[in-house]
Design a protein with these regions (language model features):
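Short aromatic-glycine-(Arg/Gly/Cys) micro-motifs in beta-strand/loop hairpins
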Residues: 22-37
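Gly/Ser/Thr-rich beta-alpha loop segments that engage phosphate groups in nucleotides
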Residues: 31, 41, 71
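Short, charged, surface-exposed hinge/linker loops at domain edges
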Residues: 1-19, 23, 52-77
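A short, exposed loop/beta-hairpin motif centered on an aromatic-Gly-Thr core
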Residues: 38-48
Length: 77
């Protein structure tokens, strides 16, 4: 029997709001990280590029983990 947690679709996870942390990199540019998704981070020269890339990284992280059948954590506020 599948419970509600197991029945969640990839689209469900893609619509969740995972908090993003952005900070300046000591070598220049910015680093963005989603702490709820282990290893989901990116580095770019501008804040705009950093935001765009962390959103792409989040989607790829979620798609990969979902396809592997692993547990996806929910966002922590």
């Amino acid at each position: 029997m599948i419970n509600a947690v197991e029945a969640r679709t990839l689209n469900y996870y893609l619509t969740l709001n995972y908090p993003i942390t952005i900070y300046p990199d000591s070598d220049g540019g910015y680093v963005a990280q989603i702490k709820d998704l282990a290893g989901c981070l990116t580095q770019e020269e501008t804040i705009e590029e950093t935001i765009q890339n962390i959103n792409e990284a989040r989607d790829l992280w979620l798609e990969t983990v979902y396809e592997l059948g692993r547990k996806i954590p929910l966002p922590i506020d």
